[in-house]
Amino acid sequence: MDHVYSFSEAKRFPPYKSVLTFEADACPLVPNWHRELSRAWDELAAPKDVKMFGARVEHPLPHINGNAMFSGDLKFLYWISRLIGGCDPTQGWDFRLARDFKREGWMDCPLIKSHWQKKTMSPDEIHSLRSSGVVLLHGVKDDSVIADTRKRFVG
């Protein structure tokens, strides 16, 4: 976020409507996943001035998982990168900052799902998520999701 803020503020980046952050255990489920997320931002998040748009999880307390889209608004980017800057390393940053993100404006994104420490996922489970409209999945620790996605869409 700091990189995006610095380059946006210096006008070395064009204005971004949002920034997607995701970890190595996140996997797109459909070919045009980034377009689908962009459309969802435009239709659901932007009209409500949402700053964090991702999978709502309930454990250990309600929060939006950090594999999410964040507003490209310069004031928000300044807040998250310069005023917040970091947090207690004994907790996940998304959970630790949940109250702050809620105050800034968060929303569950129905196209992103997150699982906590899920070891594997069956093809039927993956198909069910795809069928329900999920385009980005986070939290499966083995290669079952990426292998299924490659098999379906890469060949």
Stretches found by the model and what they are:
Residues 28-32, 42-155:
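Catalytic core and acceptor-binding pocket of nucleotide-sugar-dependent glycosyltransferases
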Residues 8-10, 40, 44:
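Hydrophobic helix-cap positions at the C-terminus of alpha-helices
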Residues 1-17:
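Active-site-proximal specificity loops/subdomain of glycosyltransferases
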Residues 14-27:
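Short beta-strand-to-loop acidic/aromatic patch adjacent to the donor-nucleotide binding site
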